[in-house]
Amino acid sequence: MEQRALKHHRERLGEAIREEIGAILEGELGDPRIGLVTVSEVMIASNGKSAIVLVAVAGEEQEAVDTLEGLAAATGYIRHEVAARLGLRVAPELLFRLDQTERYGGRVEELLKRVNKRKKSSR
């Protein structure tokens, strides 16, 4: 039962961190490398010392690379702000990663369309 409570706590904390990082990214960072970005999910490690922040970046591959570089440069500021806003003594180390689900989802849709075309043409 204790583990379920800890897991629930990590999930709630991850959601709160996701919301705060989203607010910070909306207007507080002046880094021109950071493009149009959405925080998809924050996954807190079981020990609570680190968190993977999945971000979706609008645009081309190079824009995603530039945005991740900008986020890496601003990680200290973002971590400090998250800790202050949520009243955390120590915020987890933030590791920004590109969320690939949209790209994979688009690829799956494309493959399904091909399969459906083949089914229709074989009839």
Curated annotation (Swiss-Prot):
The keyword Cytoplasm applies. GO terms for cellular component: cytosol. GO terms for biological process: maturation of SSU-rRNA. Keywords: Cytoplasm, Ribosome biogenesis. NCBIfam families: rbfA. Monomer. Binds 30S ribosomal subunits, but not 50S ribosomal subunits or 70S ribosomes. Belongs to the RbfA family. One of several proteins that assist in the late maturation steps of the functional core of the 30S ribosomal subunit. Associates with free 30S ribosomal subunits (but not with 30S subunits that are part of 70S ribosomes or polysomes). Required for efficient processing of 16S rRNA. May interact with the 5'-terminal helix region of 16S rRNA. It is found in: Cytoplasm. It comes from Koribacter versatilis (strain Ellin345). This is Ribosome-binding factor A.
